[in-house]
Structure formats: C-alpha cells, structure tokens
C-alpha cells in the first residue's frame, strides 16, 4: 500500500507523514532524499556539477535504495551528508533533469513492491502515484 502526500512547503507534510508511518508501521519516504542522493553522488564524482549530461549518467549508474534511516547510496547509508550546503546548492538543478526524475520515480515504485509506504515529495500524487 502507498499513501502519497502532496502540499506546499511548510504545510506539515513531513511531520504528518512521519507520524502516520510510525503509527502504521509503514516506511516513510521523502522523494527529495533520493534527489539529494543523486546530487551527493554527482558532487563526489564530478569536478563540474553543472555538467548535466554527466549528472544524468551518474543517476543511471548509482545504486539507490530507500531505508528507514536514510538512503543507501552505493551500499552506504547516507543521511546527514545529503543535507550539506553544497547539496542544497545543486539539488534543484539536478532534480529538474527529466532522466533523473524518471530514475527516482522508478526507485519509488520499486519500493512499493517491498514495503507499505507513506511518501511525500515532488510530483508524488500526480506523476509517481496518481
């Protein structure tokens, strides 16, 4: 089962989603964490994070898995690292790449086959889980 939560920034989506997930025993996922994981990896691997074709290639290559405590990136659990100022600086640009969005959305859909989810984030109730 998947519960998708949409809404404007600052509306309490994350708080409600986390509380509901905990109460129901569901996995809580914020799709933004996956976009941040792609950006984090791009920053680790690229000398020029503005090279969008290279970011797309990294998104296709990196292994991303949703976990209860963060995102597993190439086998390593990442959480705090995904919120660095450098990730903050680039994540919006990287998340706008259509192929990156396809990859993130595919991972979210894959997770539904393994867990009950409460998920929030970009295009979640309109594109990913309409």
Regions found by a protein language model. Name each.
Residues 33-117, 123, 128:
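ATP-dependent small-molecule kinase phosphotransfer cores
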Residues 3-5:
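Hydrophobic anchor at the beta1->P-loop junction of P-loop NTPases
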Residues 8:
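P-loop (Walker A) phosphate-binding loop of NTP-binding proteins
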Residues 22:
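Alpha-helical residues within the helix-turn-helix
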Residues 19:
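Active-site signature of alpha/beta-hydrolase-fold catalytic machinery across serine-
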Residues 13:
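Conserved lysine of the Walker
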């Amino acid at each position: 089962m998947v519960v998708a939560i949409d809404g404007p920034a600052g509306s309490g989506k994350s708080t409600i989603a986390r509380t509901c997930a905990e109460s129901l025993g569901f996995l809580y996922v914020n799709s933004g964490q996956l976009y941040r994981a792609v950006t984090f990896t791009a920053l680790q691997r690229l000398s020029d994070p503005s090279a969008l074709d290279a970011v797309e290639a990294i998104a296709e290559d990196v292994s991303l898995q949703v976990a209860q405590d963060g995102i597993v990136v190439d086998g390593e659990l990442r959480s705090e690292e995904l919120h660095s100022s450098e990730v903050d600086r680039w994540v919006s640009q990287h998340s706008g790449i259509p192929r990156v969005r396809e990859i993130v959305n595919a991972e979210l859909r894959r997770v539904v086959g393994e867990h009950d989810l409460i998920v929030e984030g970009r295009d979640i109730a309109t594109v990913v889980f309409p």
